[in-house]
Regions:
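Glycine- and acidic-residue-biased ligand/ion/polar-headgroup-sensing regions
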Residues: 41-58, 68-70
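Cyclic nucleotide-binding regulatory module and flanking cytosolic helices
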Residues: 1-33, 71-72
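Phosphate-/nucleic-acid-contacting segments
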Residues: 147-206
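Short beta-strand segments in beta-sandwich/barrel cores
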Residues: 25, 34, 50-56, 93
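Cyclic-nucleotide recognition modules
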Residues: 63-119
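His/acidic/aromatic-lined binding-pocket segments of jelly-roll/cupin-type domains
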Residues: 25-26, 35-37, 41-47, 63-64, ...
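Polybasic "coupling" helices that flank or enter modular domains
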Residues: 113-171
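Residue-level signal for tight coil/turn positions that link beta-strands
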Residues: 49, 90, 192-193
Length: 206
């Protein structure tokens, strides 16, 4: 699904929520944790500015990286369905909407198409991730995340390739270090102080 379509859908939903004034604004700095379920209330969040990670509650693994504009919590219905939390990466602005207000607004404003578009986009991301993690080959998983990281032109200048991969997998640091070192020696990638600065076509097998 085209990124532009996702962005338009998110902007449309955020615009209607702002007009309805059915939210409270959260302004947070980086490295803050925000829950989807708090004080017996389910929340949906509109990311109006900044960057966040969606992390699993069970093991703190990053399952998604989001940049504004975006919507968080479309699949959340009650506390039994909350498996993730938000961790901010940068300074952010989030519009927090109670579950009942969120779906009432979707119904009244006929925003089901936008909600569907964003849900499908997130499902596709999850399918791609799960397909990569289904591989029993550690190198195959590392290769997958190197390719993803390389496509994130702005982010790769700020983040370490080590932390990017380690936060998204259960691969040991020693195993990852060996693979990255061998790829550097083979001339497939180039790193400086943990930053990925160049990448050639990676071998399919290792």
């Amino acid at each position: 699904m085209d990124e532009l379509i996702r962005r338009i859908a998110a902007e449309s939903m955020i615009k209607h929520i702002e007009q309805e004034n059915c939210y409270h604004l959260i302004v947070a700095s980086g490295r803050q944790e925000i829950q989807l379920y708090e004080n017996n209330i389910c929340y949906h969040y509109c990311l109006r500015a900044g960057e966040i990670e969606i992390r699993r509650l069970s093991d703190d693994i990053v399952v998604s990286y989001l940049k504004a504009p975006d919507i968080v919590g479309l699949s959340t219905y009650d506390k039994s369905q909350v498996y993730h939390y938000i961790k901010t990466i940068s300074n952010v602005e989030l519009l927090a909407i109670k579950h009942e207000n969120f779906y009432r607004m979707i119904e009244e404003k006929k925003l089901w198409q936008e909600a569907f578009t964003l849900s499908i986009y997130m499902l596709n991301i999850n399918y791609i991730r799960d397909e990569a993690l289904a591989s029993r080959n550690v190198y195959g998983i590392v290769r997958h995340y190197i390719e993803i990281f390389w496509s994130m032109e702005e982010e790769r200048s700020r983040f370490s390739i080590f932390e990017f991969i380690l936060s998204r997998t259960n691969i040991s640091r020693s195993s990852l270090n060996k693979i990255l070192k061998d790829l550097c020696l083979g001339g497939y990638i180039k790193m400086e102080r943990g930053k990925l600065i160049d990448k050639k076509n990676l071998p399919l097998n290792y």
